[in-house]
Amino acid sequence: MRKSADEMFIGVRRAPISSNVGGTSFYGGDEYCSYYQSNGGVAKEDDGSAKKGFRRTGKGKLTAEAVSEAINRAAQGLPFEVVYYPTAGWSDFVVKAEDVEASMAIFWTPGTRVKMAMETEDSSRITWFQGIVFYTYQETGPWRGSPWNSFRYKIPFTIPLIFL
């Protein structure tokens, strides 16, 4: 997320936590705002101005210009930051290093079957999405030699396997 002072913040949250203490919903950055409002104080930036928190009500989301800037920086091989608005059920956004190393050891070819598990919103069951590697290609851009994004896959429009 980006603040008006051009600061970027990145965070990963497994699931939303909601509470209505004092009429305020603690969701995302709301607990920050609620803390300072309930204690009668205001957090200060280094320059003395009031610090602004982020809320999940739409305030604080990235602008199209910020996304475009990150894309341009990535295309030039410069450092950039990734912002992700997680939702419950998006499992495995952060992947174990062992899983990455194991997948990099696989010789990916067209026709290779792939499968991804995703939890439902209430975490009561797991849905498996299956796909097939459609084609592989040699990366020629600034990420040449990187194992990431070196193949495309299709997920057939079939009913996913659901395990209770």
Curated annotation (Swiss-Prot):
GO BP, one annotated term = regulation of DNA-templated transcription
Q: Domain of life, per the record?
A: Eukaryota
Q: Which InterPro entries match?
A: ARF_dom, ARF_plant
Task: Answer whether the UniProt record assigns the keyword Mitochondrion to this protein.
Answer: yes
- Subcellular location(s) of the protein: Mitochondrion
Q: What is the protein's name according to its record? A: Uncharacterized mitochondrial protein AtMg00940
* Keywords of the record: Mitochondrion
Q: Which GO terms describe its molecular function?
A: DNA binding
Please share what else the UniProt entry notes about this protein: A stretch of 270 kb of the mitochondrial genome is duplicated within the centromere of chromosome 2 resulting in the duplication of the gene. The expression of this duplicated gene (At2g07677) is not demonstrated.
Fetch the Pfam families from UniProt: ARF_AD
Q: Which Gene3D superfamilies match?
A: 2.30.30.1040
Any one of the GO CC terms: mitochondrion
Q: What is its main location?
A: mitochondrion
